A protein has these predicted regions:
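Short solvent-exposed beta->alpha transition segments
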Residues: 43-65
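Short, low-complexity N-terminal intrinsically disordered segments enriched in polar/charged residues
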Residues: 1-40, 150-155
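Short secondary-structure capping/turn micro-motifs that flank functional sites
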Residues: 42-43, 126
Length: 155
């Protein structure tokens, strides 16, 4: 059976590792890769969508990155226990007209014994920003290790 370490029960350090792995995966914007960290029958609430299973999650992510261009994400630990992690995040993107946004949100994750995510509940709000207000300027892909996190940026 496939495992995705770190495995529950989580410590503060392993929760932070799991979060950074998720951030890196989402910053790849590769739905084929991303869905592999979820159970086959994963259940999500993402904004006003409720996908079930990897295929529906893949479709959601594909649509997401067709709309949210030049996507850059930072996640940060909020809380953890046994097999659950709470995360806060922000990401910046622009639409096809060039309008920039910073999206703020919270996620609640639950993992199975193999470290695959069973449940993901996400609440997200979009804030229209000027390009000059952007704070996430690294090259597309993984956030550099020396780039400030959300708290460091005052977010």
């Amino acid at each position: 059976m496939t495992t995705k370490p770190p495995l529950p029960p989580f410590t503060e350090q392993t929760a932070i590792e799991k979060i950074r792995m998720a951030e890196d995966a989402w910053n790849s914007r590769d739905p084929d890769k991303i869905v592999l960290v979820y159970t086959e029958n994963t259940k999500w609430r993402n904004r006003n969508e409720f996908p079930i299973g990897r295929n529906q999650v893949h479709a959601l992510l594909t649509r997401k990155w067709q709309k949210e261009l030049n996507y850059r994400l930072i996640k940060e630990l909020w809380a953890y226990t046994d097999n659950r992690i709470a995360v806060r995040f922000a990401y910046e993107w622009h639409d096809d007209s060039g309008q920039y946004y910073r999206s703020y949100g919270n996620e609640n994750w639950q993992f199975n014994e193999q470290g695959l995510m069973e449940y993901r509940h996400a609440s997200i709000n979009d804030l229209m920003i000027d390009e000059s207000e952007r704070k996430f300027h690294w090259e597309l892909g993984r956030r550099p290790d020396d780039h400030p996190g959300l708290s460091d940026l005052g977010l």
